[in-house]
Amino acid sequence: MSAGDGLPPLREVVARHGLEPKKALGQNFLYDLNLTGRIARAAGPLAGVTVVEVGPGPGGLTRALLAEGAARVVAIERDPRALPALAEIAAHYPGRLEVVDADALAFDPRPLVGDAPARIVANLPYNVGTALLTGWLDGEAWPPWWDQAVLMFQREVAERIVAGPEERADYGRLGVLCGWRTEAEILFDVSPSAFVPPPKVTSSVVRLVPRAQPLPCRAGALEAVTRAAFGQRRKMLRQSLKALTPAAGDLLAAAGLSETARAEEIPVAGFVDLANRWDAHRKAGAPVGTPA
């Protein structure tokens, strides 16, 4: 397939630079520039926007983002084999592509983004996608540095991101954290045949838009409560929350929740209430029923 941006076809780039995907890095490359273009367009108009991309590999999505008009792309890549291929793209789009040789799990892109409008668009490596997302949702400061994220995950992870109590099998800590701070939706699925090598499962592209004003809650408190609650999801909350406090029953009563309730039955607002009450309870002298 010839590319419409004047750069060589991706298969040729991969062959020339010896970029066969590595399973250890969670790499599955997209060669179809029509598909990468669709992903880039899902992030909306990109004029004037800085896009942060994780795991660009040979640069198929990178090229699509630049072709769709992104003012600047910050591409974070830990595989040194990909750097020469990305350098070729940077030369083709002078001043618009900054390649960072780093592990995205340990790298903070905010100093490079600055005050410019920013989005995250990425075909995330399967082995670190969830960890990256929870990191972007973390922190007490909100709204975050990004105004939208368009991300590729395994379908089962995507379903967990958008799940609520009505989808009990998929609903968990990830769904609570995403539902608390973002509006999340699955945009479309991507067949395994679109990737090289083809994974064993279908993938999905998810869009997350930060809520301007999430329900007030300390992020660390919500993380602690959901970790305890879903860590033993089949147990009643009065048992699973004892990992946090011996007063779990009083905490549930103060929140108006049944002691026999299980984590998968509690909506996001219920977990926020629990987290606020637990946060108050852990402060010296604060009664269980007092919100933080």
From Swiss-Prot:
It holds the Pfam family RrnaAD. It is found in: Cytoplasm. It catalyses: adenosine(1518)/adenosine(1519) in 16S rRNA + 4 S-adenosyl-L-methionine = N(6)-dimethyladenosine(1518)/N(6)-dimethyladenosine(1519) in 16S rRNA + 4 S-adenosyl-L-homocysteine + 4 H(+). The keyword Disulfide bond does not apply. Its EC number is 2.1.1.182. GO terms for molecular function: 16S rRNA (adenine(1518)-N(6)/adenine(1519)-N(6))-dimethyltransferase activity; RNA binding. GO terms for cellular component: cytosol. InterPro entries: KsgA/Erm, rRNA_Ade_diMease-like_C, rRNA_Ade_Mease_Trfase_CS, rRNA_Ade_methylase_Trfase_N, rRNA_adenine_dimethylase, SAM-dependent_MTases_sf. Keywords: Cytoplasm, Methyltransferase, RNA-binding, rRNA processing, S-adenosyl-L-methionine, Transferase. S-adenosyl-L-methionine binds at residues 28, 30, 55, 77, 103, 123. SUPFAM superfamilies: S-adenosyl-L-methionine-dependent methyltransferases. Specifically dimethylates two adjacent adenosines (A1518 and A1519) in the loop of a conserved hairpin near the 3'-end of 16S rRNA in the 30S particle. May play a critical role in biogenesis of 30S subunits. Belongs to the class I-like SAM-binding methyltransferase superfamily. rRNA adenine N(6)-methyltransferase family. RsmA subfamily. This is Ribosomal RNA small subunit methyltransferase A. It comes from Methylobacterium radiotolerans (strain ATCC 27329 / DSM 1819 / JCM 2831 / NBRC 15690 / NCIMB 10815 / 0-1).
